[in-house]
Amino acid sequence: MSRSSKVVLGLSVLLTAATVAGVHVKQQWDQQRLRDGVIRDIERQIRKKENIRLLGEQIILTEQLEAEREKMLLAKGSQKS
């Protein structure tokens, strides 16, 4: 085999190995991004449920506060009469 043939073969093997390694690294990176996306979605769903629960509590507390204010206004109104 001539020297130039050996060089071309060596470069071809090197380029092929680099391409295969690059593809594997990119696949691993893509898989990790997919896993991270799923984890973020689950965390987002948990936060959404928590926010809905807190909103429900706030609505109940607001209704209780408004009822107490109404009672106080009625009590003050009956005292003035």
From Swiss-Prot:
<keyword id="KW-1274">Primary mitochondrial disease</keyword>
<feature type="transit peptide" description="Mitochondrion">
    <location>
        <begin position="1"/>
        <end position="22"/>
    </location>
</feature>
<keyword id="KW-0809">Transit peptide</keyword>
<protein>
    <recommendedName>
        <fullName>Protein PET117 homolog, mitochondrial</fullName>
    </recommendedName>
</protein>
<dbReference type="InterPro" id="IPR031568">
    <property type="entry name" value="Pet117"/>
</dbReference>
<keyword id="KW-0496">Mitochondrion</keyword>
<dbReference type="GO" id="GO:0005739">
    <property type="term" value="C:mitochondrion"/>
</dbReference>
<comment type="similarity">
    <text>Belongs to the PET117 family.</text>
</comment>
<dbReference type="Pfam" id="PF15786">
    <property type="entry name" value="PET117"/>
</dbReference>
<keyword id="KW-0225">Disease variant</keyword>
<dbReference type="GO" id="GO:0033617">
    <property type="term" value="P:mitochondrial cytochrome c oxidase assembly"/>
</dbReference>
